[in-house]
């Protein structure tokens, strides 16, 4: 007997907006009027590549009638979150589950975990003791530092096998000292992607039009402080930073190969290209589709930010740490696509706890990653389109809304096209800057080459 189209595709719904701590049992209670195939095994959560819950799941049901019942739960609440329910199918479910999460082809079986929330001054020996009985590979521990040589509170640890790494994950939320430690699945690819700053950071470029001479960290200045020394030690070491006491695990972070250690020490990430002189961000985008946040509560966590953008699913959140080691109230949030980044801008001026948060778009249609410049603008932002080589700048125009083409002082025939939002900025009156920006962009891209 031929199966119907519905039978071949299965009876599946996709759920979005789940609380991060949600369990399969809670999903079953949410769909208590529906018959779920195989009980809790019919609830298939979607995870990020770092092993964090994405807030989404697929639910396999027993019939088309059960799917219709499940769809009636759309926009109902679970805890303090409203949950969206969409019709899906087994083809979509299988593809998504195969290509996402820490067990996707490019992240599986390398035994990495990422630790977050380490106490200030936490040593390698304390981490080894924390994972007592679990074998860590030689040179398999990395303690990233900021540009002043201070610990970021994170660590990457590579275990002797994926099975041992799975055991390590069970220590999630256990304590080192007075701090509870969060543990996520990771991978060699994540380590390199997260902390490999572009080589342009080794060059001294001339200042951009918005660099501030008195800003301290403007003009791409690089100081040879403790961070530089720690980088130098790690970058010349073998593996993931040199070997020292304990059988070693150097503090440095370098995958070392060429004269500066091809994948530079993490401390260089903190010395980002402040061409517009406005930030202390160590964030390096991998997709080119980001939103910068300003005005965050000082106690805001990554999970608070993920919740803030729900039901959108950011790929990565980076909370900025200032030179004094304290949070700055700013963060960079990376999205998979330009469309997601634009949709996230709907949250501009929304509240997080008692603070309203300003958002600034750092994304260009057609950009597929790479380095980019950004300037923060008040009240609104216009995003330039068609940037080449992944490098672009964000410019301000004279009206409200978002436009995907803009120019400082272009000719009168300059046209606006395809803007996002309800309004369009007027013709820029900031003549005289266009040539500077073009020269600066040319110089910037030549350095990237």
UniProtKB/Swiss-Prot annotation:
Metal-binding among keywords: no
Residue numbers bearing the Omega-N-methylarginine modification: 233
Region (2 X 19 AA perfect repeats) location: 354-392
Residues found modified as Phosphotyrosine: 246
Chain spans, region 2 X 16 AA Gly-rich approximate repeats: 234-433
Key words of the record: Acetylation, Isopeptide bond, Methylation, Nucleus, Phosphoprotein, Repeat, Ribonucleoprotein, RNA-binding, Ubl conjugation
A GO molecular-function descriptor: RNA binding
TM stretches of this protein: none
Keyword Ribonucleoprotein found: yes
Superkingdom assignment: Eukaryota
Cross-link (Glycyl lysine isopeptide (Lys-Gly) (interchain with G-Cter in SUMO2)): 35, 87, 98
Function in brief: This protein is a component of the heterogeneous nuclear ribonucleoprotein (hnRNP) complexes which provide the substrate for the processing events that pre-mRNAs undergo before becoming functional, translatable mRNAs in the cytoplasm. Binds poly(RG).
Protein name from the UniProt record: Heterogeneous nuclear ribonucleoprotein H2
Species, as recorded: Mus musculus (Mouse)
């Amino acid at each position: 007997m031929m199966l119907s189209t519905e039978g071949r595709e299965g009876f599946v719904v996709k759920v979005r907006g789940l609380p991060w701590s949600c369990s399969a049992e809670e999903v079953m209670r949410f769909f208590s009027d529906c018959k779920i195939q195989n009980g809790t095994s019919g609830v298939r959560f979607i995870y990020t590549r770092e092993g964090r819950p994405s807030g989404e799941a697929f639910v396999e049901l027993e019939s088309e009638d059960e799917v219709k019942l499940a769809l009636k739960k759309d926009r109902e609440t679970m805890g303090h979150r409203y949950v969206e329910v969409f019709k899906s199918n087994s083809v979509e479910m299988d593809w998504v589950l195969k290509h996402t999460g820490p067990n996707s082809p490019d992240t599986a079986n390398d035994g990495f975990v990422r630790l977050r929330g380490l106490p200030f001054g936490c040593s390698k020996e304390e981490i080894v003791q924390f994972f007592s009985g679990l074998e860590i590979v030689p040179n398999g521990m990395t303690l990233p530092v900021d540009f002043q040589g201070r610990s970021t509170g994170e660590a990457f640890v590579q275990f002797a096998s994926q099975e041992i790494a799975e055991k390590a994950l069970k220590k999630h939320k256990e304590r080192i000292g007075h701090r509870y430690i969060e543990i996520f699945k990771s991978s060699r690819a994540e380590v390199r992607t997260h902390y490999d700053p572009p080589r342009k950071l080794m060059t001294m470029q001339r200042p951009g039009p918005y660099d501030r001479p008195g800003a301290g960290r403007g003009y791409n200045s690089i100081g040879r402080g403790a961070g530089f020394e720690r980088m130098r030690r790690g970058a010349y070491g073998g593996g993931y930073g040199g070997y020292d006491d304990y059988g070693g695990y150097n503090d440095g972070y370098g995958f070392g190969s060429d004269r500066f250690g091809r994948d530079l020490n993490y401390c260089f990430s903190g010395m980002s290209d402040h061409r517009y002189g406005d930030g202390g961000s160590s964030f390096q985008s991998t997709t080119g589709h980001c939103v910068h946040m300003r005005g965050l509560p000082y106690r805001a966590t990554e999970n608070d930010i993920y919740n803030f953008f729900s039901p959108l699913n950011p790929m990565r959140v980076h909370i900025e740490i200032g030179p004094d080691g304290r949070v700055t109230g700013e963060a960079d949030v990376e999205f998979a696509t330009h469309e997601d980044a634009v949709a996230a801008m709907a949250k501009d001026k929304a509240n997080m706890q008692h603070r309203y948060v300003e958002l600034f778009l750092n994304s260009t249609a057609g950009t597929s990653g790479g380095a980019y410049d950004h300037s923060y603008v008040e009240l609104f932002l216009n995003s330039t389109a068609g940037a080449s080589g992944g490098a672009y700048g964000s410019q301000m125009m004279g009206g409200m809304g978002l436009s995907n083409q803009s120019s400082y002082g272009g000719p009168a025939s300059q046209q606006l096209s395809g803007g996002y939002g309800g309004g369009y900025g007027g013709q820029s009156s900031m003549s005289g800057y266009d040539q500077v920006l073009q020269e600066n962009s040319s110089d910037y891209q030549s350095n990237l080459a």
